[in-house]
């Protein structure tokens, strides 16, 4: 089992800029940072999370840490053993397929509605994210930024049908799928494929073709799932 990832002095947590300008509750900050590191595989499956160590690292009491861990449990990203330890879960292929089903069903409906009556400002914003992604294609030093822009692109689509909260809900429920995508995105040619798929989705939406929008989005969201057997074979230690 992987040792506690917070047990050494050089493994520190950075403080990201707070989003939205408002004050973020302490438990939400702890949850968000831990979740981001788990999704990025900086905290890998089987890693042990010790509440007292986390409280020290975040300079908080154990109460917000407990709340954050509870949310991570609800996301299926950790398992807590009473009076013992909290362990990061391995990626579960069955859960990946469930999460893919959920995300595909919802996001295909989003693009269909956008094609029928899209918000021009939201679509303009989505196009802007694609231009930024274009500058990063095949730059493996910028994979993390490319991934952030990918998430921003999809969030813009949800905002275009006035469903930004639904996008956050989908993100929270798709942690296993997100970790699979973390493994897949650095693959040769993958970022170029993602960008091309995003462009195809936008072209279909802007053409007002709901059926084509759905087909292109479904194809786009299924790429990592199709590659999952190969990814599992290459990273057996990360999967259950």
Per-segment meaning from a language model:
Residues 1-2, 57, 186-240:
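C-terminal regulatory/effector modules of DNA-binding transcriptional regulators
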């Amino acid at each position: 089992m992987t040792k506690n990832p917070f047990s050494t002095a050089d493994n520190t947590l950075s403080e990201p800029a707070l989003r939205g300008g408002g004050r973020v509750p302490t438990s939400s900050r702890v949850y968000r940072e831990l979740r981001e590191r788990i999704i990025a595989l900086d905290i890998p499956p089987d890693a042990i999370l010790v509440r007292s160590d986390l409280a020290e690292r975040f300079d908080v009491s154990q109460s917000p840490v407990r709340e954050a861990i509870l949310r991570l449990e609800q996301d299926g990203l950790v398992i807590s053993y009473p009076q013992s330890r909290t362990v990061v879960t391995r990626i579960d292929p069955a859960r990946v397929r469930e999460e893919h089903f959920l995300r595909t069903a919802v996001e295909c409906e989003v693009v269909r509605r956008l094609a029928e009556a899209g918000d021009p400002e939201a679509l303009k914003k989505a196009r802007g994210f694609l231009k930024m992604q274009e500058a990063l294609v095949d730059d493996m030093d910028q994979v993390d930024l490319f991934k952030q822009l990918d998430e921003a692109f999809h969030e813009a689509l949800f905002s275009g049908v006035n469903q930004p909260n639904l996008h956050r809900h989908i993100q929270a429920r798709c942690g296993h799928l997100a970790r699979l995508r973390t493994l897949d995105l650095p693959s040769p040619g993958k970022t170029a494929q993602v960008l091309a798929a995003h462009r195809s989705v936008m072209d279909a939406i802007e053409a007002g073709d709901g059926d084509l929008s759905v087909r292109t989005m479904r194809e786009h969201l299924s790429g990592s799932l199709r590659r999952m057997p190969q990814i599992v074979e290459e990273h057996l230690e990360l999967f259950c």
